[in-house]
Amino acid sequence: MEARRLAILCSHLNPPGPNPTRDPTLRVSDCSSGSSGDGKVESSTLQNDCVFCKIIRGESPCLKLYEDDMCLCILDTNPLSHGHSLIIPKLHYPTLEETPPSVVAAMCSKVPLISNAIVKATGSDSFNLLVNNGAAAGQVIFHTHIHIIPRKERDCLWASESLRRHSLKLDKEASQLVSCVRRHLCSLPEEQLVQPS
């Protein structure tokens, strides 16, 4: 598992393909979020060894699809399908739990716009929206990001799609799970539970 993570990280650091200085479609991201007015991101908001932070600072190349003041969307350098893209916040948050709701909302608000363009451009039928949050879930780069993975009918991308699902048993175990989740939600500060109007 560790070797796989290292291989994926290396593929993000050294993407295969054209030399960025020769390919006019390859852009280096310029970062405006968290800036001090000169277009540079404050070092306290980014990590020196994070590949996504390097992209945001303009130190690593990327194929940029979209950018605004909160996030950018790039093509994944190790795609699961043609057009596999990543929406990345411009400030460094290692996991989804550590990412402020306003940043998550900004990223998610771009999904319809970006995914629609990707689906049309790739001739796909649909897409998966995915967040690998934590090592056990397959997160390799610890900078929050959302995957947009274009799909075509019968592409057999996920082996689990062929697995039969089991119906939820409405038993004591399920009731205990519901109670436990609700207890955890009730223990959160009220401002985390209030929905914006």
From Swiss-Prot:
Substrate binds at H147. The active site is at H145. It catalyses: adenosine 5'-phosphosulfate + H2O = sulfate + AMP + 2 H(+). GO terms for cellular component: peroxisome. It is found in: Peroxisome. A motif (Histidine triad motif) lies at residues 143-147. This is Adenylylsulfatase HINT3. It comes from Arabidopsis thaliana. The gene is HINT3.
